[in-house]
């Protein structure tokens, strides 16, 4: 993908390698006066047709329905669907030709509500489309296609056993672009990264006639049918058949599987790590954990079955292994190496996944479409003897939802005492989080560019508590070579290994995992567990919401032709059920794909092996990351912001004088590839507080904003902006904030509507346009002097959450002072020590605090200069999430 900024419309434009526009992102959401999301989308397309590369005439029938039979019409767009999630509606328009939908070709507009405002648009349209209209007789033949005709077209021999199970479920006409590589699913042969080959059902299709050419468009019939195989007695398929010749252009079974993966939170993930899957029950059993099986139906006639409101364990595939039952009041407690244990795990994990999705605010019935609930799960299936290491998720007719999920084994060394692969939460996440969520939205088990996002869920949701020796092995119990830390050299987008399937899935998992790490996944343990869990949950929500915005026509054929845009649109929407406003993480998402090789300069010839380019304009305040987005826990220590007591322009920080005019300064740079113009810097201050909320707690300085000189690209120059006049009123050094923006690079605060608020910990570290300084240098001559000054620097702890939270303060002293017996106590407003640094605060409530030092062995100012950690740092946590802090460097006494 290449990206440029269109200054006329203030829009970022993404184009593919052929220069076709694939995405539009306004610098700021475009507010519409429309009375519906569809009207807002229609107006946006009409106003931006040229920018999107669409002829205005192609938009004349946006509200018309797609045709069932060919009519006299060229390439145009017609309404397909509206999909609402939380506060955002995706309005999707199918590209049509002859009035028929063009397969997987669409324009989608993402519209946020109250008021309606367009946040982005994506396109998978086919440029320069032409197709021949087939004869009327050929069209009539496919109106009434029967089983024998279809069997012949599929290459099945008359009277063959397989043909007897053939049943047509639906047909419709489309325009399809033929690609030889996509005619049938190709099995991935074993190699350096795989231990076993991946088996996909296929049929002996007849050869294509000479009239079928690569990239040609053909009026075709989409035929959904059932056809059993030896492994899958009930299997739904899709064939796309050229109407004129009867040639099968595309064939897919609605099934997908993952090979050689294997336990609950698997024994490698849980501490202590181990044992391996070939271990005996005596070694595996200690890893078992007693959990409540939620949603079970009441016992019937004194017998409890593994059947619930969301999931039911059923023997729907061979081998015939009936699920266990227990007398009323008896737990499902079994040895690890038993089919019964696998059944209990199958119920728990599959139910757990659906409840995870539901708990994030997604309605199961609407998100999973026609998927029947309770969803059938076979703990010991997969066809035949089932003696394989595998699992799969089958689709309904037409691939519109989940038919059933089946699990085989996790180890083949002891088939007398089998251990099921359903015991591995990571495998369940790959199946249901990968294929299960794709079926109802794109009517396929796969993305157009990658196997799925299942590896991403497996990696991200298991990482916060993982004890695995290598956190980047995606399935650590039986290592099949799949990783989520693939280097850009060799594993870039459009690189050597971006070939689809499991290979590209590793590139996708690496990119998603980088987002997770930036949002808190790299927080230090054990204190950072809350930040890790929040990041894992939020990134999982973004992936779910992005998938939920897709349609069969917008299933991304390439990562930069719909998926990146879907993630960015998901971020801009508000997570209404959790109380998180959207728009905080878009820059991190863009950066994560950039680091994996996307956004190359125009004209770059694949294979890509280097990181991509930053945005054209990317002004920033350097917090030590040079404008990038690696995890930054101490986001409040930005040294590019400082105070002077006089407007002298010097760069050494001076503590502000309360009640007097002070002068703030900031350094800014431009990481982008183009010169930044129209730069402005806004300045704010706030009471010395951990847990601040924007904009509630941020007060503009007396000099609220200043213009800044143009900035050269590539961080070549640094400009100092100031002075900003301000008058602090609070003892203890008020917090200082700066926000820089330029034409083409607005801060994330521009994404927020009036009345919306966001805590600093979600805002500041994820927007390089913003800098924050809660740094209070403490001047002293000796230990007693230092103790006295510190005791006079009060601060406030605020709970920024919308619910009551357990607050935790973690204070650190210089290592040398700890060794010399120094201690630090945190005191409440009445002067009493806070036991364990922990207290509970209601939503938005505050507590005034102060610091008391308990002296140990003495030290001198001369010694302090040699210490690398000569500071007190106080970190604040709310329900385990790092929300901010205060830092007090030890410094020689200042003059003046």
Which residues make up each language-model segment?
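Preferential activation on post-signal-peptide N-terminal prodomains/segments
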Residues: 1-160
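Extracellular protease catalytic domains of secreted zymogens
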Residues: 283, 322-361, 368-611
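Acidic/polar low-complexity interaction segments
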Residues: 2-7, 11, 33, 176-211, ...
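Surface-exposed intrinsically disordered loops and tails
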Residues: 175-213, 272-282, 312-326, 330, ...
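Extracellular/luminal regions of secreted and cell-surface proteins that mediate adhesion/ECM remodeling
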Residues: 607-896
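Charged, low-complexity helical/coil segments in non-catalytic cytosolic or luminal regions
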Residues: 123-212
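Active-site-adjacent structural elements in enzyme catalytic domains
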Residues: 39-51, 58-115, 242-247, 253-256, ...
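Short, small/polar residue-rich loop motifs at catalytic or cofactor-binding pockets
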Residues: 105, 233-236, 421-422
């Amino acid at each position: 993908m290449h990206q440029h900024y269109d200054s006329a419309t203030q829009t970022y434009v993404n184009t593919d390698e052929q220069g076709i526009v694939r995405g539009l992102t306004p610098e700021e959401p475009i507010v519409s006066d429309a009375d519906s999301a569809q009207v807002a989308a229609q107006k946006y397309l009409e106003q931006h047709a040229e920018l999107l590369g669409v002829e205005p005439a192609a938009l004349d029938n946006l509200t018309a329905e797609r045709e069932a039979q060919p009519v006299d019409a060229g390439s145009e767009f017609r309404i397909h669907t509206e999909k609402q999630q939380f506060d955002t509606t995706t309005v999707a328009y199918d590209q049509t030709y002859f009035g028929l939908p063009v397969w997987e070709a669409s324009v989608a507009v993402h519209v946020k509500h109250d008021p309606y405002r367009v946040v982005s648009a994506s396109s998978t349209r086919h440029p320069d489309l032409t197709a021949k209209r087939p004869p009327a007789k050929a069209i009539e033949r496919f109106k009434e296609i029967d089983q024998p005709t279809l069997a012949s077209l599929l290459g099945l021999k008359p009277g063959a056993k397989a043909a007897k199970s053939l049943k047509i479920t639906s047909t419709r006409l489309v325009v399809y672009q033929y690609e030889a590589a996509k005619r049938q699913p190709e099995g991935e042969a074993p190699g350096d990264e795989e231990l076993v080959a991946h088996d996909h059902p296929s049929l002996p299709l007849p050869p294509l006639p000479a009239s079928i050419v690569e990239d040609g468009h053909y009026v075709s019939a989409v035929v959904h049918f059932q056809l059993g195989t030896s492994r899958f007695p009930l299997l739904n398929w899709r064939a796309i058949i050229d109407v004129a010749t009867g040639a099968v252009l595309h064939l897919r079974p609605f099934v997908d599987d993952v090979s050689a993966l294997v336990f609950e939170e698997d024994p490698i993930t849980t501490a202590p790590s181990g044992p391996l899957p070939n271990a005996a029950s005596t070694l595996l059993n200690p890893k078992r954990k007693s959990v409540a099986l939620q949603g079970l139906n009441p016992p019937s006639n004194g017998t409890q079955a593994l059947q619930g409101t969301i999931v039911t364990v059923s023997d729907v595939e061979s081998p015939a292994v009936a699920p266990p039952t227990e007398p009323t009041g008896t737990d499902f407690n079994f040895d690890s190496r038993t089919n019964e244990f696998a059944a209990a795990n199958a119920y728990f994990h599959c139910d757990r996944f659906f409840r995870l999705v539901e708990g994030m605010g997604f309605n199961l019935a609407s998100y999973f479409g026609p998927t029947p609930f309770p969803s059938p799960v076979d703990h010991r299936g997969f066809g035949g003897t089932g003696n394989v290491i595998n699992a799969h998720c089958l689709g309904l007719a037409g691939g519109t939802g989940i038919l059933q999920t089946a699990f085989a084994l996790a180890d083949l060394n002891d088939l007398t005492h089998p251990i099921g692969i359903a015991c591995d939460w990571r495998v369940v996440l790959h199946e249901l989080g990968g294929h299960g969520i794709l079926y109802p939205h794109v009517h396929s088990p796969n993305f157009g560019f990658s196997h799925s996002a299942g590896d991403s869920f497996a990696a991200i949701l298991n990482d916060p508590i993982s004890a695995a020796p290598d956190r980047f092995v995606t399935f650590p119990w039986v290592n099949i070579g799949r990783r989520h830390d693939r280097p850009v050299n060799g594993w870039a987008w459009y690189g050597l290994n971006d070939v689809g399937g499991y290979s590209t899935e590793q590139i996708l998992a690496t990119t998603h995992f980088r987002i997770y790490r930036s949002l808190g996944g790299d927080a230090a343990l054990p204190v950072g567990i809350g930040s890790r869990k929040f990041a894992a949950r939020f990134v999982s929500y973004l992936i779910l919401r992005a998938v939920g915005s897709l349609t069969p026509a917008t299933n991304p054929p390439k990562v930069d032709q719909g998926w990146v845009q879907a993630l960015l649109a998901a971020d801009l929407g508000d997570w209404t059920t959790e109380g998180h406003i959207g728009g905080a993480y878009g820059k991190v998402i863009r950066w994560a794909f950039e680091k994996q090789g996307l956004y190359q300069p125009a004209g770059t010839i694949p294979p890509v092996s280097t990181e991509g380019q930053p945005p054209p304009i990317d002004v920033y305040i350097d917090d030590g990351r040079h404008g990038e987005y690696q995890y930054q826990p101490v986001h409040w220590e930005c040294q590019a912001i400082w105070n002077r007591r006089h407007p002298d322009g010097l760069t050494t920080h001076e503590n502000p004088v309360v009640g007097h005019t002070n002068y703030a300064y900031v350094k800014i740079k431009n990481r982008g590839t183009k010169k930044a113009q129209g730069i402005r810097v806004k300045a704010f201050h706030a009471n010395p507080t951990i847990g601040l909320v924007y904009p509630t707690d941020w007060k503009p300085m007396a000099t609220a904003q200043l213009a800044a000189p143009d900035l050269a690209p590539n961080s070549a120059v640094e400009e100092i902006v100031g002075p900003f006049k301000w008058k602090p009123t609070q003892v203890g050094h008020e917090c200082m904030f700066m926000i820089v923006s330029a034409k083409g690079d607005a801060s994330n605060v521009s994404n927020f509507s009036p009345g919306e608020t966001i805590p600093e910990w979600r805002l500041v570290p994820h927007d390089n346009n913003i800098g924050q300084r809660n740094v209070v240098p403490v001047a002293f001559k000796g230990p007693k002097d230092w103790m006295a000054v510190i005791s006079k620097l009060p601060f406030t702890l605020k709970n920024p959450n919308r619910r009551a939270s357990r607050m935790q303060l973690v204070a650190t002293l210089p290592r040398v002072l700890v060794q010399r017996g120094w201690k630090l106590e945190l005191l409440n407003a009445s002067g009493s020590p806070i036991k364990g640094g922990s207290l509970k605060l209601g939503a938005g409530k505050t507590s005034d605090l102060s610091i008391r030092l308990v002296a140990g062995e003495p030290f001198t100012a001369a010694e302090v200069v040699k210490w690398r950690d000569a500071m007190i740092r106080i970190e604040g946590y709310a329900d385990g999430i790092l929300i901010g802090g205060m830092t007090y460097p030890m410094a020689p006494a200042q003059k003046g």
